[in-house]
């Protein structure tokens, strides 16, 4: 999603590949995959981000997602 990141591409790709493998293992269709990923994002925000920053971070995340989808080829 992000073009500039503080994380190494290798690390991001490794985690992404693991997550894709899990969804494929469960033969999750797109709608179920999106529900699961959305629940994961919600869990991360609620369990790891202070209440003052949750809405701000959720907005930044959703904006980045929208930009990624708009700019995909």
From Swiss-Prot:
Cross-referenced InterPro entries: UPF0352, YejL_sf
Superkingdom, taxonomy of origin: Bacteria
Pfam name, any one: DUF1414
Similarity-based family: Belongs to the UPF0352 family.
The protein's name: UPF0352 protein HSM_0097
């Amino acid at each position: 999603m992000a073009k500039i990141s503080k994380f190494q591409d290798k690390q991001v790709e490794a985690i992404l590949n693991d997550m894709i493998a899990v969804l494929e293992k469960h033969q999750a269709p797109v709608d179920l995959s999106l529900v699961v990923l959305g629940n994961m994002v919600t869990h991360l925000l609620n369990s790891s981000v202070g209440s003052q920053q949750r809405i701000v971070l959720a907005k930044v995340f959703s904006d980045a997602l929208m930009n990624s989808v708009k700019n995909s080829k």
